[in-house]
């Protein structure tokens, strides 16, 4: 999020969609208008196989269940009074509209939100069935007093909330663990785990689980009494956090492995802490790793004096090696859907099986990946007046499609044919969200947004959910009847 000098929101929070930045140099290719199309190379005795594009399939997407070709209208509606909450309540975790992030997380069609009173310190956890908008349980009171509270999804049936206070200048944290099947608070008490960075231990949302980074110890799972469970000694800086993509969250994560030496990476399960130890071959070390829905990739660095070049290796979720780039380049951690390798002045997209898909010139800072489509801007964004073309490519074939003119930078969701995007208040259109045909690039409808309000827009599972300007109503957005 970017805040201007007056503390106002510039970039919509729901627009935190991943951006693609990567590149490589390729040995075998066909150049077509600046685009490299990969061809099949069979394995040899001294190299790993590369895959034909036909072996690759795009990761399954969470598509919107309601068509977006016509401007959507509210479906189910939930207001504070429907939940038995006071008129002073809003869906928010702070009264600062540009900083409010009420959406906690979701497990399939069960979504969780924070609500707060604007006249006193009361807080609540709200659970909704996305199919109907009906409450999953009565709002759960979370009473942190004056302290800020943050909540996390922790596995399929729990939400963990924690509030840091500083009595006598030392961080002290109270935790609430809620059974999301019943709304029962199964634990409420002190914990050694904190939500404030720099406090010795820091809770983070990683996929659908909470991971605690504990200074001087490592990374730990968190149990039903806000206690530590599994431990990966000396690991830190876990990724991905705050992941927003159309694909299911990976069950694996990556961290720096200080125990393994400098510049080492460790891949592990966020469910039980199991460390995945793939075979990199002799004289190679895992310098960087990135996880994806269908596996992970590792930048394997040749040890000094080994004569081996750095290479990117591809693995499935079990750690079985499925491919190798066969080229040098830096593995990008800015895409959490498909492997990306960078080597100026171009960037390249790979399939999770190691199949080279496409290579484009430039840095691609704002490129957007939607299913099997890649949209790459032709130039940097120089200001609100400039209109740039977005080149469209089908990753299944490498063919270039219709170029798009609407700003696609802040992507939200799609129904398979129509994408939904946001714009900021500084663009010529002002703050809006709009629908665009993903094939023809035709803008189909536009809705203006009050960017100084509580308004938010999320894709949660297969549902588009909107928060009203006053923060008092959540509703689904669906095709008109």
Curated annotation (Swiss-Prot):
<keyword id="KW-1003">Cell membrane</keyword>
<dbReference type="GO" id="GO:0005886">
    <property type="term" value="C:plasma membrane"/>
</dbReference>
<comment type="function">
    <text>Involved in DNA conjugation in the recipient strain.</text>
</comment>
<keyword id="KW-1133">Transmembrane helix</keyword>
<keyword id="KW-0812">Transmembrane</keyword>
<keyword id="KW-0472">Membrane</keyword>
<keyword id="KW-0997">Cell inner membrane</keyword>
<feature type="transmembrane region" description="Helical">
    <location>
        <begin position="18"/>
        <end position="38"/>
    </location>
</feature>
<protein>
    <recommendedName>
        <fullName>Uncharacterized protein D806_5234</fullName>
    </recommendedName>
</protein>
């Amino acid at each position: 999020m970017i805040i201007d000098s007056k503390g106002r929101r510039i970039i919509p929070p729901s627009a935190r969609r991943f951006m693609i930045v990567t590149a490589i140099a390729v040995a075998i290719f066909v150049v077509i208008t600046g685009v490299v199309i990969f061809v099949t190379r069979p394995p040899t005795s001294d190299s790993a196989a590369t895959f034909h594009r036909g072996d690759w399939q795009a990761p399954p997407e969470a598509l919107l269940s309601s068509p977006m070709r016509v401007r959507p209208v509210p479906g189910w509606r939930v207001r504070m009074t429907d939940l038995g909450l006071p008129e002073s309540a809003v869906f928010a975790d702070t009264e600062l509209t540009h900083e409010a992030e009420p959406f906690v997380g979701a497990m399939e069609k069960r979504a969780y939100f924070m609500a707060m009173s604007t006249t006193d310190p009361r807080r609540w956890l709200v659970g909704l069935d996305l199919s109907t908008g009906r409450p999953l349980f009565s709002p759960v009171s979370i009473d942190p007093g004056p302290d800020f509270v943050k909540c996390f999804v922790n596995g399929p049936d729990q939400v963990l909330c924690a509030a840091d206070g500083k009595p006598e200048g030392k961080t002290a944290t109270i935790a609430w663990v809620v059974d999301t099947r019943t709304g029962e608070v199964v634990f409420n008490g002190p914990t050694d785990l904190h939500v404030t960075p720099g406090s010795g231990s820091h809770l983070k949302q990683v996929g659908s689980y909470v991971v605690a980074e504990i200074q001087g110890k490592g990374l730990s799972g968190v149990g039903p009494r806000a206690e530590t469970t599994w431990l990966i000694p000396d690991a830190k800086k876990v990724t991905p956090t705050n992941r927003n993509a159309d694909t299911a969250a990976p069950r694996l994560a990556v961290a720096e492995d200080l125990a393994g030496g400098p510049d080492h990476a460790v891949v592990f399960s966020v469910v039980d802490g199991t460390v995945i130890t793939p075979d990199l071959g002799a004289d190679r070390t895992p310098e960087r790793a990135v996880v994806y829905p269908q596996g992970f990739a590792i930048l394997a660095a040749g040890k000094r004096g080994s004569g081996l070049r750095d290479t990117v290796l591809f693995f499935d979720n079990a750690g079985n090696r499925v491919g190798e780039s066969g080229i040098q380049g830096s593995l990008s951690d800015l895409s959490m859907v498909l492997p990306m390798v960078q080597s100026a002045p171009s960037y390249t997209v790979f399939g999770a099986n190691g199949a080279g898909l496409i290579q484009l010139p430039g840095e691609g800072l704002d490129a957007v990946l939607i299913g099997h489509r890649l949209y790459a801007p032709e130039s940097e964004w120089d200001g609100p007046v400039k209109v740039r073309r977005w080149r469209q490519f089908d990753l299944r074939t490498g063919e270039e499609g219709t170029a798009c003119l609407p700003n696609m930078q802040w992507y939200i969701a799609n129904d398979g044919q129509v994408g939904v995007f946001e714009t900021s208040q500084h663009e010529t259109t002002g703050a809006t969200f709009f629908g665009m045909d993903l094939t023809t690039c035709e803008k189909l409808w536009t809705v203006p947004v009050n960017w100084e309000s509580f308004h938010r827009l999320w894709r949660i599972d297969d549902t588009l959910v909107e928060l009203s300007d006053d923060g008092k109503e959540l509703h689904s957005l669906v095709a008109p009847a």
